[in-house]
Amino acid sequence: TGVSEKLQHSSNIEKGLKLLKDDGIRAVWNAVFPKNILPLQLGYSSSGEVLQTGKGVSDFHAGDRVVSNGNHAEYVVVNQNLCTRIPDNTDIKEASFTVLGSIALHGLRLSETSLGSKVVVIGLGIIGQLVCRLAEAQGSEVIGIDPDTKRTDMSANFYTSVEEANMTNVDSVIITAATSSNEPIEVATKIARNKAKIVVVGDIPLNISRNDFYYKELELVVSKSYGPGRYDKQYEILGKDYPIEYVRSVSYTHLTLPTNKA
């Protein structure tokens, strides 16, 4: 979250840079964050060391290196369901991206793809890149789409357009773009096979055509952050877990898996 999300479109970035050059960082801050929304906590993916634990916490101890959905601050308080230990062979700075990995992982799980599936990822920001890596790791055939050549240059399987990729009959399209344009969802319906699944992870409008979904019997799912338990006060604040026989992968497991290196 934060300034990067507020300035996600190129026109806003140009305005922000000009304001920064002319009037300084405080002017940019005041323009992006009006006074009526302060105080504001920035960020949701952090790593650090446990200083102290509360009553009833038995899984963590002072000195443990952990990742969490805590804000970007020197000190944060986080429920144990939203923390996981950092493996000894993982750098603490690298681990700070874990929550982003869990968002990518949850989106991929919702796509219900597997070995040999054809997956297209639209939007190659950091979460889109992580979805691609995870999908490749499970043995899927992955194509990434993004208009930014700096992003597509990172892999031979990344393209600036669907026409360039020449991809059809896709099993699942995962949209990780952040845009006000309706193009991502329109593109997804065109390249998806009959009965395919479209998963929306990014912030996009959903002005869908009924006919596009009707004739192909497409399934649309909007991914919720890093999975079951998110925004549930019983889970996030009171620390009550879900029964494993009903919910196999919760927010905690999605946090835990990306911390382990292959």
Predicted regions and their residues:
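A glycine-/small-residue-rich N-terminal strand-loop-strand element
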Residues: 27-38, 45-69
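N-terminal glycine-rich beta->alpha transition that marks the start or flank
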Residues: 1-46
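A structural motif shared across PLP-dependent enzymes of the aminotransferase-like
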Residues: 69-80
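Glycine-rich cofactor phosphate-binding loops and adjacent beta1-alpha1 units
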Residues: 156-221
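Rossmann-fold dehydrogenase core element
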Residues: 211-249
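Conserved small/polar residues in nucleotide/adenosyl-binding loops
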Residues: 253-259
